[in-house]
Amino acid sequence: MAVNHTSETQLAGWIESIEDFFHLAYESKLVSENDTRTFWNLVTGFHSDHAADQQKLFVLMKKWKQQLDREKRGERAIRGLTDNEYACLVFQGSQVLVQKAGGPVGWEQLSFEERSRRIMDMKKQLTKDIGEAEFQRLSDVEKSEVDLFLWAGCCMHKEMNAFKGGCVGLDEFWDEHPEISSPLPLPNRDNAATIQLASGTAAATRAKTRTERGAQDTLRFYFDYKIGFNLAFPDTSNTRFQSHAEACALIITHLDLFIEFLTYVKLNKGSGALNHMEQNVLNGLHDIATRHELCAITLYWLAISIPYMREVRGPNAKEDNILKLDGFHRRVIEHIDILIAHPEFLVGPNASAINGSLDSLSWERPDAFYAVQTYAPGLPHLTAVLVHFLNIRKNVPGSEVF
């Protein structure tokens, strides 16, 4: 509906589309008036993701709804005036226009089209002012009902933003505990020759795609050979919901196999050495601090993210109206508080889905849960990292508002 993502352009697209739909309904005899203001006055809510342009669009749309309401109220009030009463108001407005133009001489120097435009704008503003005066005569309750326009954010995006906040907040944990070795830095190293000779060319892009596809295929074949089925690594290159958390779960579940695979790759290379990226990955897999983060993210994904999405988007969801999910969202925060107070519900011999999972149902990926428990004894700070993640996630700005 819009050629770009500016909020103003999107609003214009909405207005144009509603006008088209409403006119079609009028031509089809489904509505008695070809006036889209009837639609906008009935609209009471807007549902979108949490992007800044969408939140601004909500504000603009609310103002548009209010503007149209005041116009209709003004028109109704004007119809109740006598001709002389309305003519008097227009005359007073015209006098103001003449004064703003510099007096009668300045007014006459304006073109006919410009004078007509200013008079038309004055009449529109007069209608709005009368409508606003009529609105102000309503009680506070009536005003609230007239201007009712709610915004609800996308649950999926809200959880994604909260999860991202928790991940970013992990850096704070290591900064606050300098006595503990932080995750191993994994610096990039660009292929300078490729950049100089073919940066941005189609050939370079195709070569990169073929390389990535080849590595993925080799990994799938290796997993199929080792465990009897292949695994597609989550597409973390794209903005796909929960792909990063799912990737952490996959890595920790098959950590030994990933390390074994990279060793296999190294042994089968003519140079007998991994490239920079492959060596980075192998170093990260061996890094104890990185394993702490992989396990903490996996536990959060299993305990909160998956059951949360089951409730708001799953086939057995109890409610499909976001306005009725306020109690559920409060329960999410309450459960996170429980896990902060009792991390043993997720880590340790007494950890279980009954106490640890938001919905107390079986783990979506029990293999990932048990893999974390296997590595937990060798991760002395896992509980502290997990609690820090949960605290940061709970306090991400706006987390309590859905």
Region spans (language model):
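Long mid-to-C-terminal assembly/interaction modules of large eukaryotic proteins
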Residues: N321-F402
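A eukaryotic "domain-edge + linker/cap" signature
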Residues: D20, S28-S352
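Electropositive, glycine- and tryptophan-enriched low-complexity nucleic-acid-binding patches
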Residues: M1-R37
